[in-house]
Amino acid sequence: VQSMDKLKAIAEKSGLKQFVVKTPENSTESILQQTALNYMKAADMLETFGVRLLLHNEAGDIQTKIAGKTAYEHLLDLCMGKVGAQVDVGWVQFGGEDPAAFLERNAARVQSVHHKDFGAGREPIDVPVGTGNVDLAACFRFAQSRDIPQLVDQEHFDSDVPGELQ
């Protein structure tokens, strides 16, 4: 309860409308079920002061499959609509899925799109957004057509970041 009071104070002071959490490191069925219960409880509490809880993905929860779905999608299913999706398209791509198709498949629950881009290869090497292997134009169109908030994770700074975002 104390932590929820702190989150409420932060949200009220800053105008935040979303808090983002991630999937657990070990995506087993039992861990995901317990995580879903915890996240739904937190989402219910956050909702009382107008804040939505979102789930962010990593590559591992896209690569891991449970019941024919990614562990990320399975956890969202277990949360029964109480937790929205913040899809990191770079990690979706690196996890082996097509980001645009993944967004479309999960359109009803995507509340935020997190743009990140990686170069080709087996390692997730951050590159300037728009210069890597993610079809960011399709991801931008998806979010813009639905008025979904977007954020750009630009960790590669030795170039013209504003120019690259155009």
Where are these regions (language model features)?
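Histidine-acidic metal/acid-base catalytic patches
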Residues: 12-15, 66-84, 91-166
